[in-house]
């Protein structure tokens, strides 16, 4: 199955503590999860590694969120949208289901 959500897509969170927040997808994992910029921030307690010169402490980083809990954001409608696939000039492209507009890659 082709990936409906891709890197650099603007998405909106549908459920959870960050519901309603928008962000850009930084990484798509093979497990069906994505990492979104500024969303699902967790605090990780980092041990110091003197050999590498790394300092210890509490580091805030983005954790993965399931792809079913996000939707692509349509700027034209200002809402979350669904994605479809179609062929244009022999190429498979993604489009917004609500208005049929092609999604630029």
UniProtKB/Swiss-Prot annotation:
HAMAP family: Ribosomal_uL24_B
Source taxonomy: Bacteria, Pseudomonadati, Pseudomonadota, Gammaproteobacteria, Vibrionales
PROSITE patterns reported in the protein's UniProt record: RIBOSOMAL_L24
NCBIfam families found in the cross-reference section: rplX_bact
Protein name per UniProt: Large ribosomal subunit protein uL24
Name of the encoding gene: rplX
Annotated coiled-coil segments of the chain: none
Keywords noted in UniProt: Ribonucleoprotein, Ribosomal protein, RNA-binding, rRNA-binding
Keyword rRNA-binding: yes
GO term, biological process aspect, one: translation
UniProt family annotation: Belongs to the universal ribosomal protein uL24 family.
A cellular-component GO term for this protein: ribosome
Subunit structure: Part of the 50S ribosomal subunit.
GO molecular function, one term: rRNA binding
Gene3D superfamilies: 2.30.30.30
UniProt xrefs under SUPFAM superfamilies: Translation proteins SH3-like domain (SSF50104)
Function field: One of two assembly initiator proteins, it binds directly to the 5'-end of the 23S rRNA, where it nucleates assembly of the 50S subunit.
């Amino acid at each position: 199955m082709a990936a409906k959500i891709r890197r650099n897509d603007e998405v909106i969170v549908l459920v959870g503590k960050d519901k309603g927040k928008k962000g850009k997808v930084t990484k798509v994992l093979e497990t069906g999860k994505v990492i979104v910029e500024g969303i699902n921030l967790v605090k990780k307690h980092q041990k110091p590694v003197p050999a590498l010169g790394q300092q210890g402490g509490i580091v805030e980083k983005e954790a993965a969120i399931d792809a079913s809990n996000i939707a692509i954001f349509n700027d034209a409608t200002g809402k979350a949208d669904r994605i479809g696939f179609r062929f244009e000039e022999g190429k498979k492209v993604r489009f917004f289901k609500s208005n049929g507009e092609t999604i630029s890659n």
